[in-house]
Amino acid sequence: MNKDTKEHKRLEEHYSKKKDWLKWGPYLSERQWGTVREDYSPNGDAWNYLPHDHARSRTYRWGEDGMAGISDRYCNICFAVALWNGKDPILKERLFGLTGPQGNHGEDVKELYYYLENTPSHSYMKHLYKYPQNEFPYDELVAENQKRGKHDLEYQLLDTGIFDNDEYFDVFTEYAKAEGEDLLVKISICNRGRKMAPVSVLPTLWIRNFWSFLGMNKKPIIKREGGKQSQYVSIDHEYVGKYNLYFDKPSRLLFTENETNMERVFNGTNEHPFKKDLFHDAIIENDFSVAEKNMHGTKCAPVYELEIEPGETKTIKLRLTKNAVNSPLGTSFDSVFSKRIKESQSFLETVTEKSSEEQREIQKQAFAGLLWTKQYYNYEIEQWLKGDPGTSPPQERWQGRNSNWKTFRNHDILSMPDAWEYPWFAAWDSAFHCVTFSMVDHEFAKKQLLLFTKEWYMAANGQIPAYEWNFSDVNPPVQAWAAIQIYQMEQRKTGKGDLSFLKRMFNKLALNFTWWVNREDSSNNNVFEGGFLGLDNIGVFDRSNGVPGGGVLEQVDGTSWMALYCLNMLEMALEIAKEDDSFEDMCLKYFGHFVFIAEALNKISEGSSSSWDEQEGFFYDKLILPNGESFPIKVRSISGLLSLTAVLNIRKETLEKLPRFKSSLAWYRKYRMENMKYQVIEEYAPDKDVLLSLVPRERMTILMQSILNESEFLGDYGIRSLSKAHEKPYNIQIDGDNYGIKYEPAESTTDMFGGNSNWRGPIWMPMNYLFISTFKEYHNYFEDDLKFAYPSESGTDLNLKEIGFEISKRLIAIFAKDTNGNRPVNAIHQEKYTDEHFKELILFYEYFDGNNGRGLGAAHQTGWTALVANLIEEINR
């Protein structure tokens, strides 16, 4: 791969600390309102404490938000785009969506916007927002969705008909960096309608408010320089120094303060009229007498009152720079943009060199979404609990949400699952994000993964915080798996893996592994139980709220995740031990632990049943009641298939370098044979690779037949999360109450976990990626000695590598055009997405309909759904 592109050089300059190319980026959140961080209510009602209607008038404490925005890495100075079509009741400063309680399937953004391009250094970025020319249907979206139930489709913006006559603007926002602190901005507004339409554009610059909460030696200021006809403002900020913002000549220039309108929000008194929502008042009421009075403030916007003819595009240029520039918007401006666009294309081509044109477009937008959703995230639990000077948060907080995480304190750039729907980190999501990040920026991927092991994130007992709604929830421990993936990707592309990174991850994850063992294996039988494991509603009851009847649920997925964790730690230790033989002892530790887990899952002990059902050929959760009675929960879900993912092929070359470990393997096998114990290593020869698998080959074969059965798990677009066999519902009675589950290929029909995700049939990209990686690992050992009919009963036998390839193609097909030019992801709105100005736009949803591939859940989850970019790279490798 050509690593001599300008973008590669920028990354090298940044990570070698020669230049700071990442000081500025798309770090501005898309939604700060309705978050846990901004919630100071006594009952933890985050959605209603600071709702969308307050956001324009109320100062945030822990961050900022806006549309197509940027900030410096600590969110001191922010820039974003605001719009008004002359008809809306509010100035469009931020994206609108429904709260969790408002939506019939939980929270949901109700806007059309797309991440088109982004480079890892953010040297070039492009964003598209589609803004209706008629009044935005705020009330209609809320009212109609509240009428709908869990069994109904969500009412989306396209369903309102507001785009039917193409009466909308395409608003393209582009950024190009001349240098790390010299950002060029271009806002292009195109009228897609058939008649002239007016629009007011407010490129808005503002300063995050610290002075109202923490106090500052000197309040920052934005002020107009050079008199009333000048076209630039200066920023003076004690934390980041001085900047200038240059801009095309506006219709007018407005200033106000980024401070709460106490009168509007709290029925209080304002000491002056310059409040956060002043631009809204001025624009909507067409009264600029106050907003134009001052030539300084902490929030500023040049206003461009445009009239745009049909098909016409008007462009606004701005430049935010650390240094004074002569002719800032002149020919050099266009030259920089032209260079950065070409460099972005060149970088993309090196990363996707073997992809087809269509595949490259999918990858480009997947990378763009991943990079656009890097966000500044600030949350200091102890400060949040006790409040700022002059404030008195309710005492209930000290016993409420996250109150036992007082050591958590961060202000970092983190990868968000979705910058509007999930504008907070989720530990296991982030691990998957990093695997795709590693395709474009190895260093960011490694640093991001390491962050979660830092002492200001990880608790002293080794627990990794889950997500802000409840840091104490438990998510699948996939950090070690991701670390190995990233290490191997870098090794494959550069010829050398980062052993220091691997060691650092290993040492901290050893603490986390111990926490898992101590917390989740209460019976000390190596079968793991209890808690929420990230697959929200996959069980017959909410697993995070305890077990009905006071029993214990021995979870096959919990046990499988721990077995996978064991093997990931073993693989890391093996790699490190090749350079540092002191790690051989850790190899033995994790191998031994894996042996006991494998034995426990397949056969716990004499007189005790395993999780495996011989008659049905599946692993099931087991419910143990207080009276000792136990029975399986016979749900055929990916929980029962996860046992396949715990597999490791240890190369004979590795074993030759580690003689103590090799002899221990032989001893273990001999000892267990002599004592009639469960054989973990089925096939063993001193001169061959060694396969460690949680499930024996016979059971693995049976499970594979279920996976590849199109009447069960194999859908046209990937592996389903629940067997289609459950079209006939499964029901069970526990302690006098009835519980059930059925195949639901689309949205959730339950309120479990807010009801905005569904693991009862849809296709999830991260789990599919994990299975495909698993198939490759098995193939590395068996090669052509193990084949399966694909699909089952097809009569066509493929090896496991080929099967992974074919399933990858099904997943990629979700986003690709079919012979009619339709993308399955757009199943409901196909007609609109064949339109000239929609057809190349791709959304990367949270999960996908198990029958037709339709996108579901969060619409911009290019967090883990960006893994499709990895799949494309892998099938072309």
Q: Where would I find each of the regions flagged by the language model?
A:
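Acidic, mature catalytic/reactive cores of soluble proteins
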Residues: 1-57, 69, 78, 84-877
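Transition-metal
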Residues: 64-65
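Short, surface-exposed loop and linker segments with low hydrophobicity and enrichment for Pro/Ser/Thr
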Residues: 73-75
